[in-house]
UniProtKB/Swiss-Prot annotation:
GO terms for cellular component: nuclear body; nucleus; site of DNA damage. HAMAP family: DNApol_IV (MF_01113). DNA polymerase specifically involved in DNA repair. Plays an important role in translesion synthesis, where the normal high-fidelity DNA polymerases cannot proceed and DNA synthesis stalls. Depending on the context, it inserts the correct base, but causes frequent base transitions, transversions and frameshifts. Lacks 3'-5' proofreading exonuclease activity. Forms a Schiff base with 5'-deoxyribose phosphate at abasic sites, but does not have lyase activity. This is DNA polymerase kappa.
Length: 852
């Protein structure tokens, strides 16, 4: 007896799950028992039936667990939960918002209506759009037989043998939907479209503006015949009765026959008014929310010849329910007051609310909850049996609360495409379908400008078992080829798992998620080009920041200083110092105000670098002088590098003197120490000869730019005029002839192939000195020499010792002995000086000139 009762209960539950859901417009008053019997007979024994049985058992198990949990709840727990829920309900009541007017517009049987419009023969026949596998929608004639959306076509044929199933044409549906949305945008530019046939609008602002509109702006004319709409308003041509003015001629079935139009609404000009062939009438809409919605529906019907239903309420949840209240071709409004809202909610079935499906409905029915009033009465129990998100949503429904913000919640998290089809078991067809889905997904991603890293495939086999497989890649992707490469591997894995049995699918989908954000892009690996661009940006940003005295602007380059390289920061400081100097010469007192922030900037950047340094003693090689610094801390090494970088521009004379004394000490103080060379003599030495010193001292010479190399003759003449006692001499370079000839050939070809950079100073990345040239070829040669100056120095030293010089006058001998002393490497004791050849008058560039 008990087993029979259990079977009957299970059968009833299965009917509730698989039977007809009549909570849809146009399906009231049907013989559900007869319809459910046909549905059960058509599905029994099928895979779908078996899958529904399995799901029903799972739901029954959930209900059993819930009832066991309910039995263990004590009265004390229930009272505590009651206080908690009531407190939350009071908070919700305080935040209730009744100031917005939300409208939900829903087209009536949209797909079917478009097909009937384009094919008038289908107008009075039961039709559905879809296939024998699944229906997308049905018209109201078919709904009287129990045919509805989301029903297999073969079952619908059992319910209505004369049903006509029309294949869908989504391009046509999208075109009509675009026309409807153009009308909706005039009332709320920020309306939220939920699908092709429904949308939410907030007309609160429109209602405020509408109060001041004249009657002509709210008048729409109905014109018989195929004429276009003209924007110029006018007075109505014929007098209408009060009843005719109060209704929309196309919205209601009881409209007078003479007001049924065949064309579109328009506003006449004076010429068309006098045309006797034009029969016209007009409708003036009011300023209330209900009148606005009538106007919207009127315009939609006039433009598309399709009808729409609408709901008007203080929030989206109620507006959605109201739009289904008077379907088709109707509207319903809930006044913006708490009493009106609660009166509407009081007897509303819970299944009518969007978000409560058949599973939730069955679980609530097990607790004796059918209406929203009962939902509120059991609020404490629901808080103990359901998750926090669920019972919060239930309480919102029971109080008639919903969203008033039409903006979507947060950013898009994923994007997907999927397709249902008849059984596919061939691997080639599955790969081909997967490639089509990937191409469609890539197109959607590119339209939105999105890239993602996680690709997921969804597979449903013929037994209605759903599997999802995902793979995440390091870099964001968006192209069809990249997506398909990952999806194909995931699909191949599933094919191999079931081998040798084929993978029999009836649904496939591809999803992209983990979209890359701006923050993710900032942490990508830097390239060489990006590094060079960052250096150029650092120079420009430093120059711009010095033009502003605001402390907040000066702090911006400091925030980025830790991201620059060491040489970038030094180069920026050098340019800023040059800019400060030029401003002092031209702007006077104003330059002082700019100089102080630049000094503060330099001090702050130096202190920032010092704070990051470690005190551990290590061995470093100076990137400027290439000397090895042993047993020094990083801070001391940085100070050494600063001295090397700042040396040529700040303390050159003292360094030359220091080098002179140091070289004298290296030979055991056997020669007299001569005073430092005067400025005129120094210029002669720098332009007419290269003083050979240690490899470090090569960076101490003042003029190492390419200007000296390109203007050797001019500088030599200038030296002679200033100091006639300095002979015109050049340092011998006894390198191989091939090297010299190569340089000469390069020099001769340069005028034809050089690239010139204008508007930007070239700074050598090795010696960190600004080169006064715009010739990139000469600049590259200078950089090559700086990089290989160690090898060049060794060659010069080895060749210089083998050349002998004749003795000159006493004054010249003393000077040459001093130069020879600096030329000798440590440990050499010979006092013989090298003979210096006279510099040729040929203006070609030499290695000696480039080295300067």
């Amino acid at each position: 007896m008990d087993n029979t009762k259990e079977k009957d209960n299970f059968k009833d539950d299965l009917l509730l799950r698989m039977g007809l859901n009549d909570n849809k417009a146009g399906m009231e008053g049907l013989d559900k028992e007869k319809i459910n019997k046909i549905i059960m007979e058509a599905t029994k024994g099928s895979r779908f039936y078996g899958n529904e049985l399995k799901k029903e058992k799972q739901v029954n198990q959930r209900i059993e667990n819930m009832m066991q949990q309910k039995a263990q709840i004590t009265s004390q727990q229930l009272r505590k939960a009651q206080l908690q829920v009531d407190k939350f309900a009071m908070e919700l009541e305080r935040n209730r918002n009744l100031n917005n007017t939300i409208v939900h517009v829903d087209m009536d049987a949209f797909y079917a209506a478009v097909e009937m419009r384009d094919n008038p023969e289908l107008k009075d026949k039961p039709i559905a759009v879809g296939s024998m596998s699944m229906l997308a929608t049905s018209n109201y004639h078919a709904r009287r037989f129990g045919v509805r959306a989301a029903m297999p076509g073969f079952i619908a044929k059992r319910l209505c043998p004369q049903l006509i199933i029309v294949p869908p044409n989504f391009d046509k549906y999208r075109a009509v939907s675009k026309e409807v949305k153009e009308i909706l945008a005039e009332y709320d530019p920020n309306f939220m479209a939920m699908s092709l046939d429904e949308a939410y609008l907030n007309i609160t602002q429109h209602l405020q503006e509408r109060q001041d509109w004249p009657e002509d702006k709210r008048r729409y004319f109905i014109k018989m015949g195929n004429y276009l709409k003209i924007d110029t308003p006018r007075q109505e041509a014929n007098e209408l009765t009060e009843y005719e003015r109060s209704i929309s001629p196309l919205l209601f079935e009881d409209s007078p026959p003479d007001l049924q139009p065949q064309g579109s609404p328009f506003q006449l000009n004076s010429e068309e008014q006098n045309n006797p062939q034009i029969a016209q009438n007009s409708v003036v809409f009011g300023t209330s929310a209900e009148e606005v919605v009538k106007e919207i529906r009127f315009r939609i019907e006039q433009k598309t010849t399709l009808t729409a239903s609408a709901g008007i309420a203080p929030n989206t949840m109620l507006a959605k329910v109201c739009s289904d209240k008077n379907k088709p071709n109707g509207q319903y409004q809930i006044l913006p007051s708490r009493s009106a809202v609660m009166d509407f909610i009081k007897d509303l079935p819970i299944r009518k609310v969007s978000g409560i499906g058949k599973v939730t409905e069955k679980m609530l029915m097990a607790l004796g909850i059918v209406t929203c009033t009962e939902l509120y009465q059991q609020r404490a129990l629901l808080s103990l049996l359901f998750s926090e998100t669920s019972w919060h949503y239930f309480l919102h429904i029971a109080l008639g609360l919903g969203s008033t913000d039409l903006a979507r919640d947060g950013e898009r998290k994923s994007m997907s495409v999927e397709r249902t089809f008849s059984e596919i078991s061939k691997t080639e067809e599955q790969y081909s379908l997967c490639q089509e889905l990937c191409a469609e997904l890539a197109h959607d991603l590119q339209k939105e400008g999105l890239k993602g890293r996680t690709v997921t495939i969804k597979l449903k086999n013929v037994n209605f078992e759903v599997k999802t497989r995902a793979s995440t890649v390091p870099a964001a992707i968006s192209t069809a080829e990249e997506i398909f490469a990952i999806a194909k591997e995931l699909l191949r894995t599933e094919v191999n798992v079931g081998s040798p049995h084929p993978l029999r699918l009836r649904l496939m989908g591809v999803r992209m998620s983990t979209f890359s954000s701006e923050d993710d892009r900032k942490h990508q690996q830097r390239s060489i080009i990006g590094f060079l661009q960052a250096g150029n940006q650092a120079l420009s940003s430093t120059g711009d920041s010095l033009d502003k005295t605001d402390k907040t602007e000066l702090a911006k380059p400091l925030e980025m200083s830790h991201k620059k390289s060491f040489f970038d920061k030094k180069r920026s400081e050098r340019i800023s110092n040059c800019q400060d100097t030029s401003r002092c010469k031209t702007a006077g007192q104003q330059a002082l105000q700019i100089l102080e922030p630049s000094q503060a900037l330099k001090k702050l950047s130096e202190s920032f670098e010092t704070s990051e340094n470690s005190n551990d003693c290590q061995t470093f090689i100076c990137p400027v002088c290439f000397r090895e610094q042993e047993g020094v801390s990083l801070e001391a090494f940085n100070e050494h590098v600063d001295e090397c970088l700042d040396g040529p521009s700040t303390s050159e004379n003292s360094k030359i003197s220091c080098y002179s004394h140091a070289s004298s000490a290296d030979i055991g103080q056997k020669e007299d120490v001569h005073p430092s060379i005067p400025l005129c003599e120094k210029r002669g030495h720098e332009n007419g000869e290269i003083t050979l010193v240690d490899g470090v001292d090569l960076t101490g010479t003042e003029d190492r730019s390419l200007k000296a190399a390109r203007m050797d003759t001019l500088e030599n003449n200038r030296s002679k005029e200033e100091c006639p006692d300095i002979p015109d001499k050049s340092c011998p370079i006894s390198l191989e002839n091939e090297t010299i000839s190569t340089l000469s050939r390069q020099d001769s070809v340069q005028p034809c192939t050089d690239e010139v950079v204008t508007g930007r100073a070239l700074v050598c990345p090795v010696c960190n000195l600004e080169q006064e040239t715009s010739d990139l070829t000469l600049f590259n040669i200078h950089v090559d020499i700086c990089l290989n100056k160690g090898i060049i120095q060794e060659l010069r030293n080895s060749e210089g010792n083998s050349v002998k010089q004749p003795k000159e006058s006493s004054r010249s001998t003393d000077r040459l002995q001093k130069a020879s002393g600096r030329t000798k490497r440590p440990g050499t004791k010979t006092k013989s000086s090298t003979l210096k050849k006279t510099k040729p008058r040929d203006p070609r560039h030499t290695l000696d000139g480039f080295f300067k």
